[in-house]
Amino acid sequence: MKYPKMHRIRQVIEAPEVENLEETISQELESLLLESKIKPGARIAVTAGSRGINHIDRILKRIIDFLKQHEAKPFLVPAMGSHGDGSAEGQLDVLKSLNITEDTMGVPIHSSMEVVEIGKSSFDFPVLVDKLAAESDGIVVVNRIKPHTEFEGPIESGLMKMMAIGLGKHKGCVEVHKQAGNYGYLKVIPEIGQIILDKLPILFGVGIVENIYDETAKIKAVSPDRFFEEEAELLYSGGGGIKLDHL
């Protein structure tokens, strides 16, 4: 059998990595100039998801400490849709498995499946969000930004999805998936996210990008008016990812 000519090649995978995690987070948060926006005594809800984000306990702790330094009263809310068996206790167990507890974080974790309706989508579905987060003085949205396994677009899995599905708890998650089944995630997630941005006191977001080895490649603090633009820019910035339309 005659084989075609072959050449040896070597794959070089770009894998950027944040060297000093806490220092980088502090610098990012300071860049938002939040002094006038964080009032002393303000109750700030910080989202805590269920995905296995590397160093998520350290990331959340640094954000919490930053808020405390500005005399706010932060607390964590599990923001994971229906994960953890769709129960308040189950979601606390999920966070515990990620080393996120009241002891390790130094703040209360208010876990509840109660939601409130803050509006309706253009498809006439209710927009539901965690009641305790909705009643807070400010919300910090924290999530990993990465490609989604079921769809491709400028907004996939990240801050917008955390608001639309994570903060929606079980009931809100169900409503989003109903709409997505008919109209697609590319339309539904950005729309629900924008309604939440318009109706709730979103203080800022923290987008986390991981490299191909699941190490933190980049962390970006994002003002609410820049969620769309920054998330789209960060989506493939971790290295090792190739957009299909670029092949």
Task: For the regions a language model picked out, list residue spans one by one.
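N-terminal amphipathic/basic leader segments beginning at the initiator methionine
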Residues: 1-24
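Glycine-rich phosphate/diphosphate-binding loops that line cofactor/substrate pockets in enzymes
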Residues: 29-45, 68-71, 246
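Short glycine-rich or small-residue beta-strand-to-loop segments that form or flank ligand, phosphate
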Residues: 43-52, 75-80
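Short glycine/serine/threonine-rich phosphate/pyrophosphate-binding segments
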Residues: 53-60, 85, 148-151, 162
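Histidine-anchored nucleotide/phosphate-binding helix
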Residues: 54-73
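Active-site histidine-anchored catalytic micro-motif
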Residues: 57, 73-90, 120
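An acidic, phosphate/nucleotide-engaging active-site surface
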Residues: 90-154
